[in-house]
């Protein structure tokens, strides 16, 4: 988690450089939710980086994971408040594209965090974990922890079709040495 928080802070600092002509750069951070501990830490890291660089951080999130409309509203509000750079963990990699296009048409830099958009070139940049590799590592850890003992593994896909979940899932199976659900 420290690495992701650090990457978020680095992205925030890079984004702030694009807005240095202003007295105080205005940067937005939109997460999937405000309750997930990962996104809470991401916001804390961004707030620390913004304070250190004298930037104003605006933050927003969907009400729940998957709330694209909430993310669109947050993006529109941030643009209206003068944000020149917005970092976002898109809840829906396709549905957010029209809002991103509008923002970029207004000269706002958009950086996707952790979850790529579809198409990937809809944003100016992507800072992300290698989610497949993360899944492989978790699968390998699980296999080692089981030490050859039989186990029944169940995986839940709360957001079917989301690339991050699919990559982690497939990596996990690979790390366990499984080729299918059988």
What are these regions (language model features)?
Residues 3, 9, 20-182:
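A residue-level marker of the well-folded mature domains of exported/periplasmic proteins
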């Amino acid at each position: 988690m420290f690495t992701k928080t650090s990457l978020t802070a680095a992205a925030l600092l890079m984004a702030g450089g694009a807005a240095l002509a202003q007295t105080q750069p205005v940067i937005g951070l939109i997460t999937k939710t405000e309750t997930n501990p990962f996104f809470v830490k991401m916001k804390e890291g961004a707030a620390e980086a913004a304070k250190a660089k004298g930037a104003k951080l605006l933050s927003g999130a969907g009400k729940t994971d998957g709330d694209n409309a909430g993310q669109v509203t947050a993006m529109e509000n941030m643009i209206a408040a003068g944000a020149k750079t917005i970092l976002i963990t898109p809840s829906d990699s396709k549905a957010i594209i029209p809002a991103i296009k509008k923002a970029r048409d207004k000269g706002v830099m958009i950086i996707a965090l952790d979850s790529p958009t579809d198409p990937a070139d809809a944003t100016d940049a992507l800072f992300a974990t290698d989610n497949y590799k993360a899944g492989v590592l978790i699968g390998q850890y699980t296999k080692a922890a089981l030490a050859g003992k039989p186990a029944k593994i169940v995986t839940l896909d709360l957001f079917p079709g989301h690339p991050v979940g699919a990559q982690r899932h497939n990596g996990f199976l690979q790390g366990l040495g499984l080729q299918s659900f059988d």
